[in-house]
Amino acid sequence: MKIKMNSKDVNFWYGEKKALNDINLPIYENKITALIGPSGCGKSTFLRCLNRMNDLISGVKITGEITLDEKNIYDKDVDVVELRKRVGMVFQKPNPFPMSIYDNIAYGPRIHGIKDKKQLDEIVEWALKKSALWDDVKEDLKKSALKLSGGQQQRLCIARTIAVKPDVILMDEPCSALDPISTLKIEDLMVELKKEYTIVIVTHNMQQASRVSDYTGFFMLGDLVEFNKTDKLFVEPENKKTEDYISGRFG
C-alpha cells in the first residue's frame, strides 16, 4: 500500500506554546484517514501542517518533515500555491465565495491558467457531478452560491476543491455545521471520492470516524497517542487513553 503523505518527527509551536510533539503518521493513498481527539489536542493543527495553512499565522515554527510523494513540502523550493492545489482543503463552515455557483467552481482552474470557456464548462459539470450536486443546481449555475442550503454549500466547497484536480483532500470537521441528512450525503461522498483521492478528515464525531475512515489517529495534548486501522483502533485499542476516550470516559 502506497504512502501518499508521511510525517516524521513533526513538532509545532504557536509562539512559545508547543502544539505538536514528535508526530509520525503515514497517510495512505486512496484511503480515508480520520484524526480524532478532544478539543485542543492538536488534530486540526496537524491537518493544517499538511498543506502549510499554518504558514499564514505569524510566530509559528515547525520542525521535522512532511512529505508528499516523498518530497518534503517544507523544502525551500516548494511552491506553496502549487502545494495547496495538490493538497486541497474543505473547512468546518461552508465558505462559498459571494459569486455564482459556476464562478465558484471555475475560480481555481482560472487562477491556474485555464481560460477556455468550453474547458471550464466541462470542469464545472464534472466537479459538480463528482460532489453529487449537479442535479440540484444544473438548471441555474448563475445563481449565487450563498443561496444554497448549508449541505449544498459544503458539497459546493468540495466541488471547488476537486476542480483543480488535487491529490489529497483535507477536511476539517466538514459536517459539524450540517444536519444529519446532509452529513450522511457528505459521508457517502467521501467514500466515493477516495477511489480517486486521498482524504484526511478531522472529526469530533467518533461514529463518523468509524463509519467512513480506513485509518484513525487519536491525538491528545499534542501527542499522537495511537494510530491504526480504524476497525482495530475502535474495537481493540492498544492504549488505555484511547480506550478511555472512545468509551466516553473523558474528552
Swiss-Prot record:
Its main location: membrane. Coiled coil: none annotated. Its EC number is 7.3.2.1. GO terms for molecular function: ATP binding; ATP hydrolysis activity; ATPase-coupled phosphate ion transmembrane transporter activity. Residues 5-246 form the ABC transporter domain. The keyword Membrane applies. InterPro entries: AAA+_ATPase (IPR003593), ABC_transporter-like_ATP-bd (IPR003439), ABC_transporter-like_CS (IPR017871), P-loop_NTPase (IPR027417), PstB-like (IPR005670). ATP binds at residues 37-44. It catalyses: phosphate(out) + ATP + H2O = ADP + 2 phosphate(in) + H(+). Pfam families: ABC_tran. One of its GO terms (cellular component) is plasma membrane. SUPFAM superfamilies: P-loop containing nucleoside triphosphate hydrolases (SSF52540). It is a peripheral membrane protein. Part of the ABC transporter complex PstSACB involved in phosphate import. Responsible for energy coupling to the transport system. Belongs to the ABC transporter superfamily. Phosphate importer (TC 3.A.1.7) family. This is Phosphate import ATP-binding protein PstB. It comes from Methanococcus maripaludis (strain DSM 14266 / JCM 13030 / NBRC 101832 / S2 / LL). The gene is pstB.
